[in-house]
């Protein structure tokens, strides 16, 4: 008799994806972040569902409903801080996952990579709208500033902004629709993640060497289920240390003041995970130019498969490209720091240099390094 997991229509899908899946024998801990992102999404959907039971998307009561969750709901403080820090954890895993993809050349799987970029945009949109919901000072002013960027679009910009606001300023209609979108988007993300996985399993996983591994595959279970479980345990240990001991470490103190349209905070800035893009936006004096640079800072990832010049897929044996990769990582960290600083010297010029370097490394230096390394192979 055939094993049930190989014949039952539902279990067969799970079996092909998580049990009998042929996996390269040499993939490292950097391949754990896919499953960790799945865990983060589950944590966010579960905690968000319980928060939505007590939250009211109304400008008069939103802030106090969040306070009520923290003070009066059983373990409400825990659910709220799990959701807030879960977003940070999500982006930490997301950026590490993307970094792994760049380092080991995983972008050569076009469909998987492009769906990953769509997932990144969806996650960023979800996180932005979620940040608006507590209706603190930074929620209100962040929503005002970021939605206002759309007014830079020629001809239709102003109408578009008012259409998104549902009025002439960020108000009750805006909060209500942001709550609706923030609720539905994670489920769309979950569906897209399934498609992401579907395309990945069409080609099979990449590996650190960046070479075909068809001759050396092992079943996903028990080898990588065990490995993923270790990653999950370590991630949860780190996560609950954050939630229980340092819940406000990554938050903004301004968001503990209720939203006040008459009082602007001294420094309007988004959450830490958007600061690098915010720094790129601010480094260009022109509004439309800034918005284009902001979008391109993420969209530039879609160009990677088309500007690869090296004969080798992975950076494992490419010292020049490795140096440029770590320079890019350092540059993104500098941009993150600059995004949180006020717009004044010397931060302005540092931000402009870092923004220029970001695009130069990806669009010019890395392809040139690939050509040089190809020549080195012949020496």
UniProtKB/Swiss-Prot annotation:
Question: Any idea where this protein resides?
Answer: Mitochondrion inner membrane
Q: Which SUPFAM superfamilies match?
A: a domain/subunit of cytochrome bc1 complex (Ubiquinol-cytochrome c reductase), Transmembrane di-heme cytochromes
**Record protein name field:** Cytochrome b
Any further remark recorded for this protein: Heme 1 (or BL or b562) is low-potential and absorbs at about 562 nm, and heme 2 (or BH or b566) is high-potential and absorbs at about 566 nm.
Give the family, as the similarity comment puts it. Belongs to the cytochrome b family.
On assembly, the entry states: The cytochrome bc1 complex contains 11 subunits: 3 respiratory subunits (MT-CYB, CYC1 and UQCRFS1), 2 core proteins (UQCRC1 and UQCRC2) and 6 low-molecular weight proteins (UQCRH/QCR6, UQCRB/QCR7, UQCRQ/QCR8, UQCR10/QCR9, UQCR11/QCR10 and a cleavage product of UQCRFS1). This cytochrome bc1 complex then forms a dimer.
User: What does the Swiss-Prot or TrEMBL cofactor note state?
Assistant: Binds 2 heme b groups non-covalently.
Arranged from A to Z, the UniProt key words for this protein are: Electron transport, Heme, Iron, Membrane, Metal-binding, Mitochondrion, Mitochondrion inner membrane, Respiratory chain, Transmembrane, Transmembrane helix, Transport, Ubiquinone
Which co-factors does it depend on? heme b
